[in-house]
Every structure is written in C-alpha cells, then in structure tokens.
Amino acid sequence: MKRILVAAACLLPFALAAEASINRHSPAAVVEAAYAADQTAIQAGGDGIMGDNVLRARVFSRSLLRSIAANELIPTASPAIIRDPLSDQAPHMAAIDVALVSESRDEAKVLAEFARGDGARERLTYDMVFERGEWRIDDIVYATLDGRSHTLRGVLAAN
C-alpha cells in the first residue's frame, strides 16, 4: 500500500505537466482554468487570482499586469471589478459555458457566459494574446443582457 502511494505521488507531477502542456495551446482552456483556479481560491476563503501574483502572471498579459499594478498604486479604493475581474462581481456563478470565438497565430477571442446568482446571465469576451509561449488574457469585455458593456482596460484607465 505504501509503495502504491509513493508511486502515485511520483507520477502526479508528470500527469499535471502533461495536462498543462495540452491546455496551453487552447485559449478556451486557459479561460476555463482561470475560472477553476479563481473559484477554488474564493471558496477556500482567498482572494482568487487577484490575490496571487503567480496566478496573475500565468493568466494575464504583461501589458494588462502593468495596468493592474499601476491601478493598485492609486491611494483611492479600486472598483470592485478590478478585485474580481473574471465574474464582474456576480454574487454567484453557475452554468459556465466557455467557447472559442476566433483564433489567429497570436490573438484569440473567447466567450464565457454564465448565470449570475441574481437570475441574470452575463457574457464576457476575453481578448487573448499568445505571449511567452502561452495564451494570456489581455482584456475582458463585459456585456450583460440589458445592453450595458464595459472593458477591464477601460475601468483601469478611468481610475
């Protein structure tokens, strides 16, 4: 029994590395992984991706990271969307659907749609760039079904 556990523990890093190498080639998989990581951290009482600089660097482009960092230096309180950009402050997320909209060599668009806890559905479009050998989120376009829309970069620039 002990040998089986040791063998499984030794093989786990290889299995995770194989999964990571598959996912890095799919922009939609990056968005799905970002939601999974964010929700896991939030359910455990953490701040999600925005509270972990390593996760931020794996998910966001360098340009977007610089904009977020510059915004965090401003002494006034950041808008709530910046603290939780993946859900646009949805009270609860359910039935998340992620689909690739378009993909070129170095840019892609991914659509994520989910049910909010308040009964509305929300659509987020992720502008992705291929950077440092992986797909990364470069901007997020938030559009609710009532017709309002805004972007993460727009919110950052407004502060």
What are these regions, as identified by a protein language model?
Residues 98, 124-130:
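Hydrophobic/aromatic beta-strand elements that line small-molecule binding cavities or substrate pockets
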Residues 73-74, 103-107, 118-122, 131-132, ...:
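Low-complexity, intrinsically disordered terminal/linker segments enriched in charged
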Residues 21-22, 59-120:
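Surface-exposed, charged secondary-structure patches
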Residues 4-14:
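Sec-dependent N-terminal signal peptides
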Residues 28-35, 111, 125, 153:
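Extracytoplasmic/secreted envelope proteins and their assembly/folding machinery
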Residues 21-76:
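Core segments of small alpha/beta cavity-forming domains
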Residues 15-20:
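Sec/Tat signal peptide C-region and signal peptidase I cleavage site
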